[in-house]
């Protein structure tokens, strides 16, 4: 299932280029003038706010970095992504300008509420996730597809630290259902790199780490700027 992890540019506001270090504004201090949806809003529960504050304190010494999250791609990032990776006939610019990041397309509190933190030394992403009422599968619980989505974007961010990537494979073991509006911790780790292949592991646990909700492994492929996607 070749699902686009490349559109994580939405979150990063990154500018694709041949040099990976120049592509990811997410991992730099460069400002992007857009609303950042990875900040507290009235829908966040006390548990989510508490965890967010704890990780913000970890950011003070520079070991962790909070990652911003936007609803739409900055125009320049979108244009340069298409220039490097997509045939010009693929989509018209006016069409793509209306596209929104899937996980940010619902009203605040109803869908995906999350904040991500990146540890460069550990090659790890931690996502604090609260599933809203419009993510329901079985009554009272988060839909398995929504869980797969939050795993995909969290694991993808680990891989994205190495370059622009797409999801090639995602294997998920659902252990315990996740109640709606509960807060869980999605922990993703870059395990190894083999050429353009990046292997990532991921778990979802309760905030007290006593309950393992989900385990997953993922394979991402680093894109080649000389080979358009279409």
From Swiss-Prot:
Residues annotated as catalytic: 152
**InterPro entries (alphabetical):** HotDog_dom_sf (IPR029069), THEM4/THEM5_acyl-CoA_thioest (IPR052365), Thioestr_dom (IPR006683)
Q: Which GO terms describe its biological process?
A: fatty acid metabolic process; negative regulation of phosphatidylinositol 3-kinase/protein kinase B signal transduction; regulation of mitochondrial membrane permeability involved in apoptotic process
Coiled-coil region list? none
Q: Name the chemical reaction catalysed here.
A: hexadecanoyl-CoA + H2O = hexadecanoate + CoA + H(+); octanoyl-CoA + H2O = octanoate + CoA + H(+); decanoyl-CoA + H2O = decanoate + CoA + H(+); dodecanoyl-CoA + H2O = dodecanoate + CoA + H(+)
Q: Per the UniProt record, which EC number(s) apply here? A: 3.1.2.2
Q: Which domain of life is it from?
A: Eukaryota
The stretch annotated as transit peptide is 1-27
Listed as disulfide-bonded, the cysteine pairs are none
| A GO CC annotation given for this chain | ruffle membrane
Supply the alphabetized keyword list.
Acetylation, Apoptosis, Cell membrane, Cell projection, Cytoplasm, Fatty acid metabolism, Hydrolase, Lipid metabolism, Membrane, Mitochondrion, Mitochondrion inner membrane, Phosphoprotein, Transit peptide
UniProt topology in membrane:
Peripheral membrane protein
Question: GO molecular function: any one?
Answer: long-chain fatty acyl-CoA hydrolase activity
The record describes its post-translational modification as: Phosphorylated.
In this chain, where does the modification Phosphoserine occur? 28-29
Residues found modified as N6-succinyllysine: 46, 57, 89, 98, 197
Q: How does this protein assemble? A: Homodimer and homotetramer. Interacts with AKT1 in the cytosol.
> What does the similarity note say?
Belongs to the THEM4/THEM5 thioesterase family.
What is the protein's known function? Has acyl-CoA thioesterase activity towards medium and long-chain (C14 to C18) fatty acyl-CoA substrates, and probably plays a role in mitochondrial fatty acid metabolism. Plays a role in the apoptotic process, possibly via its regulation of AKT1 activity.
Name of this protein: Acyl-coenzyme A thioesterase THEM4
Record the organism: Rattus norvegicus (Rat)
């Amino acid at each position: 299932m070749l699902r686009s992890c490349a559109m994580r540019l939405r979150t990063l506001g990154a500018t694709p280029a041949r040099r990976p270090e120049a592509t990811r504004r997410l991992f730099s201090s460069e400002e992007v003038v857009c609303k950042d949806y990875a900040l507290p809003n009235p829908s966040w529960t006390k548990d989510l706010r508490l965890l967010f504050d704890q990780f913000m304190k970890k950011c003070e010494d520079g070991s962790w970095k909070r990652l911003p999250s936007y609803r739409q791609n900055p125009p320049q990032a979108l244009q340069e992504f298409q220039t490097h990776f997509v045939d010009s006939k693929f989509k018209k610019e006016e069409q793509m300008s209306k596209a929104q990041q899937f996980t940010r397309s619902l009203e605040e509190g109803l869908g995906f509420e999350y904040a991500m933190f990146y540890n460069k030394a550990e090659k790890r992403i931690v996502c604090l996730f609260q599933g809203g009422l419009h993510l329901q599968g079985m009554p009272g619980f988060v839909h398995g597809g929504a869980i797969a989505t939050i795993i995909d974007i969290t694991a993808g961010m680990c891989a994205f630290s190495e370059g622009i990537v797409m999801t090639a494979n995602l294997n998920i073991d659902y252990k315990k259902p996740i109640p709606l509006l509960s807060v869980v911790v999605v922990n993703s780790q870059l395990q190894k790199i083999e050429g353009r292949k990046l292997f990532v592991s991921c778990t979802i646990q309760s905030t007290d780490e006593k309950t393992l909700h989900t385990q997953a492994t993922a394979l991402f492929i680093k894109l080649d700027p000389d080979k358009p996607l279409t």
